[in-house]
């Protein structure tokens, strides 16, 4: 395979190549062994994960990548590869500049860069091959989201792309579908080859969500993938990498572990995605990202996605992308999703539990509702979860000190509605993609307004409406002005005490109590799961069931 010459057809990726093996979810994300033969929630998770290192909450940050050799790239000697696949549909070409401008304005879309392709208005105009198109239509999507309308032509053109859009805007498919087209145009993997597509994500939860999309839409092409993240044993991930995968979705720390150990390499990567780049920088991953990118050929195609566009992310784009084109959906100012009703209550710490219970009573009157509660620390997350469970509410918590199999189980219980209340720290604020969350409750206000936007963005997704309830104390008064600005922009009601705080840094106080819930027989709560869960999630439900 001396040349990366163009024109490789999907049919060439046939049975002789893959033998029908698709890794899908078989790489240690918590489901492949966990639910089989375990008799419910107990046996399945008991073994195989004991050495996961989940107590550290994720990837090590110290001196990662020191063992990676600096690459000296000679572009003339590198094999050629295909990356430009976009052919403008006649209907797109026929639209006037004014029509294009009106479409972008209607969808709050701005573009920057040289020769940005026009947006598409339906799936057929995107120019995807039939095997991709049929997968999309089989999922029941009616039309592209705003980011997809503009992002697909950009990514398919082979250009480097920056996309700025709110969480829940459909950005994952915006880069996943072009990635599938890109893979199918490349030569088949040879033994010892690393992935063709590398997707870097800040959290394990987000990495697993991305893998689900890739698995769904890459099935017909038999594209193999693996998810590489910390907090679980390396064995299944190493096996996937050694067998060969076209797509690797990874958190930076664990990927560097694999590279340093020689378990994979990035020599074949020609399509690089940095998802939630702002969050990766917030979490301190910049040195690791730079080390990883140094191992990838510089003429690759790079797509960077972010919810915000601070100067640190702009610098990353300048360093990693060449002649990039950019699409922004919505205002570039810090703003909240306008489909979310924001309720901010000025309270004291003593009032929080009582007010939380009163809100939950109202929220859980509708049995299909789901509420995500954010706390400022892992300790408070566990305390609140224990308090709620003892009072009869089927709440579970998720944070970085819980081992991966427990986090996966909690997330699944929440997704399926078996436990419709989940308590989380900010580790979950971007990594969790549960589309039908109806309510977010900020028990503790986050450290900055960006995290507030991302937290409440867990609700009101995919065109739905949502409600965000926030407890704000005098300790948060320094952030009152920013919060009032966000509320004003979204035309929300503002508590007079919050407005006063924004001007003078004032605040108020009160007292605690309990509430009611309502009984869902046969659930069993935190009991009978083999003792593999942390104390807060294993706390028995109180006798007065609330749901």
UniProtKB/Swiss-Prot annotation:
Predominant location: cytoplasm
Biased composition regions of type Gly residues, renumbered to the chain: 509-531
Biased composition (Basic and acidic residues): 10-21
Region ranges (Disordered): 1-37, 509-547
A Pfam family hit: DEAD
Domain spans labelled Helicase C-terminal: 355-502
Annotated protein name in UniProt: ATP-dependent RNA helicase dbp2
A GO-annotated cellular component: ribonucleoprotein complex
Organism whose genome encodes this protein: Aspergillus fumigatus (strain ATCC MYA-4609 / CBS 101355 / FGSC A1100 / Af293) (Neosartorya fumigata)
InterPro entries per UniProt: DEAD/DEAH_box_helicase_dom (IPR011545), Helicase_ATP-bd (IPR014001), Helicase_C-like (IPR001650), P-loop_NTPase (IPR027417), RNA-helicase_DEAD-box_CS (IPR000629), RNA_helicase_DEAD_Q_motif (IPR014014)
Role played: ATP-dependent RNA helicase involved nonsense-mediated mRNA decay and ribosome biogenesis through rRNA processing.
Binding site for ATP: 165-172
Gene for this chain: dbp2
The reaction(s) this protein catalyses: ATP + H2O = ADP + phosphate + H(+)
Subcellular location as annotated: Cytoplasm; Nucleus
């Amino acid at each position: 395979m001396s040349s990366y010459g163009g024109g490789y057809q999907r049919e060439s990726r046939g049975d002789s190549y893959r033998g029908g093996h698709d890794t899908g979810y078989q790489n240690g994300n918590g489901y492949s062994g966990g639910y089989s033969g375990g008799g419910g929630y107990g046996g399945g998770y008991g073994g195989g994960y004991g050495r996961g290192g989940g107590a550290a909450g994720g990837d090590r940050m110290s001196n990662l990548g020191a063992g990676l050799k600096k690459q000296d790239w000679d572009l003339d000697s590198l094999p050629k590869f295909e990356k430009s696949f976009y052919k403008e549909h006649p209907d797109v070409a026929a639209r006037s500049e004014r029509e294009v401008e009106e479409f972008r304005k209607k969808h709050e879309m701005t573009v920057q860069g040289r020769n940005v392709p026009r947006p598409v208005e339906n799936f057929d105009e995107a120019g995807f091959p039939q095997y991709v198109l049929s997968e999309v239509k089989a999922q029941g999507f009616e039309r592209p989201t705003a980011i997809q309308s503009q992002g697909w032509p950009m990514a398919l053109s082979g250009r480097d792309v920056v996309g700025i859009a709110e969480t829940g805007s459909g950005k994952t498919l915006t880069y996943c579908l072009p990635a599938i087209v890109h893979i199918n145009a490349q030569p088949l993997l040879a033994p010892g080859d690393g992935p063709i597509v590398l997707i870097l994500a800040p959290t394990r939860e987000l990495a697993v969500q991305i893998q689900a999309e890739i698995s769904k839409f890459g099935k017909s092409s038999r594209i193999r993938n693996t998810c590489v993240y910390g907090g679980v044993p390396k064995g299944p991930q190493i096996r996937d990498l050694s067998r060969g995968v076209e797509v690797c979705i990874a958190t930076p720390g664990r990927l560097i572990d694999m590279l340093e150990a020689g378990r994979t390499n990035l020599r074949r990567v020609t399509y690089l995605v940095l998802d939630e780049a702002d969050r990766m920088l917030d979490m301190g991953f910049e040195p690791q990202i730079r080390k990883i990118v140094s191992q990838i050929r510089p003429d690759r195609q790079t797509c960077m996605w972010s919810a915000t566009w601070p100067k640190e992310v702009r610098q990353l784009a300048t360093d990693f992308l060449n002649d990039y084109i950019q699409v922004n959906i919505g205002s570039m100012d810090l703003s909240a999703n306008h489909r979310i009703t924001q309720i901010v209550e000025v309270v004291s710490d003593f009032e929080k539990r009582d007010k939380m219970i009163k809100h939950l009573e109202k929220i859980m009157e509708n049995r299909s509702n789901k509420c995500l509660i954010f706390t400022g620390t892992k300790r408070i997350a566990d305390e609140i979860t224990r308090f709620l469970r003892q009072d009869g509410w089927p709440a579970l918590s998720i944070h970085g000190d819980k081992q991966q199999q427990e986090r996966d189980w909690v997330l699944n219980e929440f997704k399926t509605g078996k436990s419709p209340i989940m308590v989380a720290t900010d580790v979950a604020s971007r990594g969790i993609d549960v589309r039908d969350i109806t309510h977010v409750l900020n028990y503790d206000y986050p450290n900055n307004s960006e995290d507030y936007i991302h937290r409440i963005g867990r609700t009101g997704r995919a065109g739905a409406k949502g409600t965000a309830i926030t407890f704000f104390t005098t300790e948060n008064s320094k952030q009152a002005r920013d919060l009032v600005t966000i509320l004003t922009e979204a035309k929300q009601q503002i508590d007079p005490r919050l407005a006063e705080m924004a001007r003078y840094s004032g605040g108020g106080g009160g007292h605690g109590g309990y509430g009611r819930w309502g009984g869902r027989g046969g659930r069993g709560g935190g009991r009978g799961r083999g003792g593999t869960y942390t104390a807060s999630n294993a706390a028995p439900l109180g006798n007065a069931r609330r749901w």
